[in-house]
Structures are given as structure tokens and as C-alpha cells.
Amino acid sequence: THASEMTIKNELAEFNFSKDHAVYLPYSTNDQQPLAMAFQNIYDATTLSQAASKLAFLPVTIDYANGIKLTLLEADLENYPGMFVESQGNEHRLQGKFAPYPAKTDFYPWRQQEYVTKAEDFIARTSGPRSYPWRILAITEKDTEMPVNNLVYALASPNRIGDYSWIKTGKVAWDWWNDWNLKGVPFKAGINMDTYKYYIDFAARNDIEYIILDEGWYNPKSGDMLTVIPELDLTELISYGKNKGVDIVLWTVFNVLDSQLEAACEKYAQMGIKGFKVDFLDRDDQKAVEMVYRIAEATARHHLILDLHGIYKPT
């Protein structure tokens, strides 16, 4: 902890190993700008000495043989950039790497997604008494222990939203997955009322609790999620779904929701929307992490669930 205001230039985080162990690394998928990507990739099975010198996101697993594995994780990431690692080759070392603090940003025209165009020469600005993220080496003797390890959850900050009995977990019917492509139906499939009523009917028949209205229910180029396209009547869809026991989740972009946060939460919660699928963060610098917390606080206050997509690992 530290009481005064600080600018944090960098953090030295090293993980040194005595041998050339096998390692499983998920590399960044963006070779040009490795800090900007969706945090989704297959794992590359290699050794510490043969691993590529490029950024990998967490979790990363080191194989100690005889069934023992160490998984590098992070917990309680708040108001701070997330950690990547990069292999140091023959040194049998993984070096922590952190996104610098954004200096300037711009927006992609198609969906108004914010991206960093210039970075500062430091990683964080912070003030007041605080703690910093946990860095975890979770030891397992069997692979079946890995997915049930609860250290990230156990080391995270306690629940801040109080009563969370309003949160309803469940499955979702997802329009984007098959590009709204319905065959053998007596209407033109697409982002329209007939298509979404069909999805609601499908969800009801198969005990699926939600449907998502993915990209296109508002004009993504506008960056305005308060204005629904004229082909859709959300009030009617919500009522139709309610009568069949199916709730609706709306897709949006992180910074678009953040820019209209209170208005969007109030409007759609009052209408009966149950949550947001929030997409295309593709960053974990300090400002991006702060945005996630703002969104989580506001949506929880309005009893809206969150489905976070295109985001860094859970902490």
C-alpha cells in the first residue's frame, strides 16, 4: 500500500525457473500491436528456451513433469494494467510486461471502438492507500485440479454489490453465431422482428433462458446505443419473450456503453432488458480496466447482468 499520489513507471515481475521446463503459452494474435487483441488464442506447447520472444497473456502453465504443473495467474486487478509475460529464451525466465498508460485514443469508424494511438512512458497513475494485484502460481498434481482451482476467486476483493439474488445464470441463443441465417422460414431472416421472435420461440422450446441481440440492433457506426433501428420494436420483443419465459440481452461496445452509461442502464433496465453483452475492449491498460469497473458498478446498480467479451482474463 502507498498513501500518496504516484506515477508508476514500470513493474519488475520475473518468474525464474531452474530447468528448461515445458510451457503452455497463449500468444497475442496481433503481431503489429500485441497489446491490442481479444485475448483469445490456442496454447502453444513448447519449452522455456524455445518459446517465442513475444507477448503471451495469462494464464500460462509450466509443466514440472510427473503430473505437477504451475499455472501463472493474476487476481484482484483494479486501477492497474494487467500482466503479460514474455519468454527470455535460454535464461528459463518469464518476464512480466505491462501495457503503458494511454496518452491518446481514436475510434474505428465501423463500430466506434476506441483504440490507443499514443502511450505514455509509464504504466499507471494512482493515489491513496491501495493494494496491488496478486500474482499467483497455482500448483496442481493432476490436470483435473486446474479448472476447479479457486485462488483467483479467493484472492479477489469481496462482493461489493450486496444482494445478488437478482442475477439469473443461464444459456443464451446467439444470433451472430450463424449470421442470422435461418433456413426454411416463411420470412426474410435478418435483424428484424420475425427473426428475433423465431429465436425466442427456439429458446423457449429448448429451455434457454436468454437471447442476445448482437451487433446491428442499433447502428454501430453511430456509437449511439440509445437509438434502436426502425426495424425493431424492443418493447414488443421484451413482452413477447416474457410471455415465453425468455429474457433479452443487448450487445454493445465497451466504450460506447461507457459513454452513455447511466442513460443506457436506466433506459433499458426500465424497459425490461436483463443485461448487456459488452464487446471489443481488446486492451488491459489501466484506463481500460477502470472502464470495466465503471460498467460493472453501474449495471449492478440497475440489476443488469454482464456478459463480457473481447476482454482480458477474469481476475
Where are these regions (language model features)?
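Catalytic domains of carbohydrate-active enzymes, especially glycoside hydrolases
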Residues: 193-216, 268-272
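An acidic-aromatic substrate-binding cleft motif
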Residues: 123-202, 206
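N-terminal accessory beta-strand-rich subdomains and adjacent acidic, glycine-rich linkers
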Residues: 1-154
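Tryptophan-centered motif/residue detector
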Residues: 24-26, 174-177, 217, 251
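Aromatic- and carboxylate-enriched substrate-binding clefts and catalytic-loop regions
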Residues: 214-315
